[in-house]
């Protein structure tokens, strides 16, 4: 999805975010985005671990 944005595209997005939210809000937005990504990765890992454990249970039976 985002694989073809490239470096210039990222710079453009950062400038647009900076203009929209201002420099004071940028750290708060970055922190919230980081926490959201961390929680998403954690949930995804838990889901795949649960599915793997369920598969192993079925194979042992």
UniProtKB/Swiss-Prot annotation:
Q: Is RNA-binding one of the keywords?
A: no
GO CC, alphabetical: TAT protein transport complex
Q: Which UniProt keywords apply?
A: Cell membrane, Membrane, Protein transport, Translocation, Transmembrane, Transmembrane helix, Transport
**UniProt-annotated location(s):** Cell membrane
What residue ranges are annotated as transmembrane? 1-21
Q: What molecular function terms (GO) are annotated for this protein?
A: protein transmembrane transporter activity
So which domain of life are we looking at? Bacteria
Topology of this chain in the membrane: Single-pass membrane protein
The UniProt entry's GO biological process terms, in alphabetical order, are:
protein transport by the Tat complex
Summary of the function given for this chain in its UniProt record: Part of the twin-arginine translocation (Tat) system that transports large folded proteins containing a characteristic twin-arginine motif in their signal peptide across membranes. TatA could form the protein-conducting channel of the Tat system.
Q: Which family does it belong to?
A: Belongs to the TatA/E family.
Q: How does it assemble?
A: Forms a complex with TatC.
Identification of the protein by name? Sec-independent protein translocase protein TatA
Protein's organism: Bacillus cereus (strain ATCC 14579 / DSM 31 / CCUG 7414 / JCM 2152 / NBRC 15305 / NCIMB 9373 / NCTC 2599 / NRRL B-3711)
The encoding gene is: tatA
